[in-house]
Amino acid sequence: MSFDINWEKLTTDNQINDSIKNFLHEQFQSLQLPSYISNLEVVDFKLGTIPPEITIRHIGDPFEEFYANPDDGDGDGNNDEEVLKDKSTKLKNRQAVNIIPNKAGATHEADIINDHDYGDEDDIDDDYDNDSDDYDDDENDGLHDHGEDEENEESSQYDEDRLSNITEGLSLVELLASASTPKRTSPQRPPLISPRGEVTQQTLSKPKEPFQSILNPYGVTSVLNQGSNAAKNTTATSIAAGTTAANGVGTLKDIFDQNNFSSRVIPKIKTKEESVSGDQQQGKQTGKANEKGQKHKHEHEEEQGSDKQNAKNKASDDVQLILEINYKGNLYIDLLVTLLVNYPSPNFISLPIKLHVTDLVIHTIATIAYLKHAVYVSFLCDVNDEADGFSGASSNASTPNVTGTTSGGGNSGGNIVDYYFSDPNNKERIDIIKKIKIESEIGEVENNILRNVGKVEKFLMEQLRAILRDEIAWPSWICVDMAENDDEEEDDDDDDHDEDNEGRGRMRDTGDVDVRDHDKKED
């Protein structure tokens, strides 16, 4: 199956050529020009007389992205921003919350230190007060820090379900190994890592959490008093090998056989303050979990609603073509630019240059979709040819190959340069343009100005390739709205219809007059 496209009718339409010229001119006007260029403008554009070779590779339904309506309102955008902020906050909490084992076997959960909720070091040290005080004082401290623990608990709840079984196992091995040789000396406070990467070291008189309180959440039923004899004859090596652990904890094999690590959710390591107020916190935690569940449910419903909306927007005549486009034609672009020589003073010499860009080579895979009375065009990827290693091409992304130099009389000069964009080491996803030729027309020139012309040409070619890649390479596309033309045609048809009705009305009136005149004549 083949299609015949009247390329001549397409290229002779001045409206299409002017629209493309205006588009390129606006893009070039938005560029930040270097110091040796000024007054850049596109003066002419023609599609040329040579049509491209187009091969249809696939026919199917349009991409879902084409159905997304950017004019739905600001509500969706605000929701997206809130989701991004929420994910960013969770990522920061994930980086800030760490479980740090100390040498005595106790652990402390690092506080979430943000720029807006932490104060002096003295305030942070309040969590590590001496346990030589009465238990009531510790309880008061726990109530004082109740709000902060609640915030840490909420932020770390999201992180715990992301920990893997390997992390849990390694953390427990470190705890057991450190517990095998307990020290009665004053332990050092584990380092606190601030968001700025600063490490501070503080000392403690005594760890607040016993080793038993850490192991209990993991389902370990052994307690410290059951294995005092085994602790004397056991070392860290025997623990790693799976023998009886210190303090009667049991072997690693026994611990892993309890199926405590089958879930990806690591149990919560409770502090003393949390244990005291655990009953009070349970109801609040349940409420927070329900709120998070409702939030995820709401997001899921929004996604389903978006899919349903896209399904409603689809029509039976929507179609998309995946095409292979191979173009080696005589399309051309005319540009005017002023070349500046900034030595010995800024703008010392200004020389207008006319650049004639032609002979584009494009071999790519593109998609053309028709839906909602609009045509969407986007380039997906390049197609490698056997002749991609053009002669004169090197590892540079844009390699000039001078095919001609001065032309015309002695008072005028110019050069013709072929630029190739074939680079095996190119990291870009798509180039679109593989080859392009530039013909420059300048006035009286010197060799140093000719070298600057080469810089101008290279700059313009790189910018042209960047414009095409950013504007019409996937995930970007251009849209040709056909609904406006249909509305104009309908308006024209309505006007013609009204004029016909008015003409018929006049004809009826004229007919009546003629009849009356005819009757008068008979009388």
From Swiss-Prot:
Locate the compositionally biased regions of type Polar residues. 178-187, 277-288
* The entry's keywords: Endoplasmic reticulum, Lipid transport, Lipid-binding, Membrane, Mitochondrion, Mitochondrion outer membrane, Transport
- Span list, region Disordered: 108-160, 178-213, 270-313, 483-523
Q: What are the SMP-LTD domain coordinates in residue numbering?
A: 1-483
Q: Which GO terms describe its biological process?
A: mitochondrial genome maintenance; mitochondrion-endoplasmic reticulum membrane tethering; phospholipid transport; protein insertion into mitochondrial outer membrane
Query: What's a Gene Ontology MF term here?
Result: lipid binding
- Listed Basic and acidic residues bias regions: 108-117, 289-313, 502-523
What membrane topology was assigned to this protein in its record? Peripheral membrane protein
Q: Which PROSITE patterns does the record associate with it? A: SMP (PS51847)
Main subcellular location: mitochondrion
Here the disulfide bonds are: none
Q: Which PANTHER family match?
A: MITOCHONDRIAL DISTRIBUTION AND MORPHOLOGY PROTEIN 12
Q: Which family does it belong to?
A: Belongs to the MDM12 family.
Q: What does this protein do?
A: Component of the ERMES/MDM complex, which serves as a molecular tether to connect the endoplasmic reticulum (ER) and mitochondria. Components of this complex are involved in the control of mitochondrial shape and protein biogenesis, and function in nonvesicular lipid trafficking between the ER and mitochondria. MDM12 is required for the interaction of the ER-resident membrane protein MMM1 and the outer mitochondrial membrane-resident beta-barrel protein MDM10.
- This protein is called Mitochondrial distribution and morphology protein 12
Species of origin:
Lodderomyces elongisporus (strain ATCC 11503 / CBS 2605 / JCM 1781 / NBRC 1676 / NRRL YB-4239) (Yeast)
Q: What's the name of its gene?
A: MDM12
